[in-house]
Amino acid sequence: ISNEDSQDIEFDETNLFSRNRFTGLDRVEGGQRLYYGMRFGVFGTSGYSDGFIGQSYRLRSDNNFSTTSGLNDNFSDIVGRVSIQPSTPVKLQYRFRLDKNDFSPRRNELSANVGPQALKLNLNYSFFDEGSGSGEFSDREEITYGFASQITPAWSIDASTRRDLQASSTLNHNIGLTYECDCFTMKLTFTRTFTQDRDVRPSDTIFIRLIFKNLGEIQSGN
C-alpha cells in the first residue's frame, strides 16, 4: 500500500500516549509499547506552574517511521511542556522535543500571552530542526506576534504576523473579526500570504466560518 497521507508525523506530548502516532489511514502503528511520563505542578492562590515530560519504549524498532521522526528506535525522543501563569493576565508556555541520545533540541516552542481580554498581546517562537518531522525540510525558525481584543461581549478582533527568521522574511499577515452569540459564531478572516515557490505566488484570501452551536459549521474561502 502506497503511503500518501501518513508521511507527515509530528511527535509531541499531546500524542505520546496515542495508540497510533501516524497521521492519516495509510499506516498503522503496531507492536508492543510502554509509555511513561511524569506530571508536576505548583499551584497558588494567584497563579500556577505545571509541566509534563515523557517517553515511550517499544520492544522492537519500527522502520515504518522515518529516522527523523523520533519514533523509529526502541526508545523514543523525550517530549514535554512547561506552563507558567504567575497571574491571570500572563501565561507562558514552553513545549519541547529532545533527542533521546544527547538531549539536543529537536523542537522548541515558546509562547507568551499577556494582557486582559480588552487587549491581549501574544508572541510565539518555534524552532524545528531538519530531523524533527518527515525530514523533507531544512531547519525552520519562525516567530508569530499579534494581538486580540474583546471590543464588546459579542464582537472581537485579532491580528497577527508570521515571520521566517532563517530567511528574514514575512510569511503572512492575518486579521480577523469575530461575532459570537448564544446561537452561532461567525468569523471573518483576511490573510495575505507572501510565499513564493514554483507555481505558488503571493496571494490574498478571505475566509468566512459560520458555526451553529447545535447544528455544525459552514465555511467558505476565496
Predicted regions and their residues:
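Outer-membrane beta-barrel translocator/pore domains, especially the C-terminal barrels
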Residues: 1-222
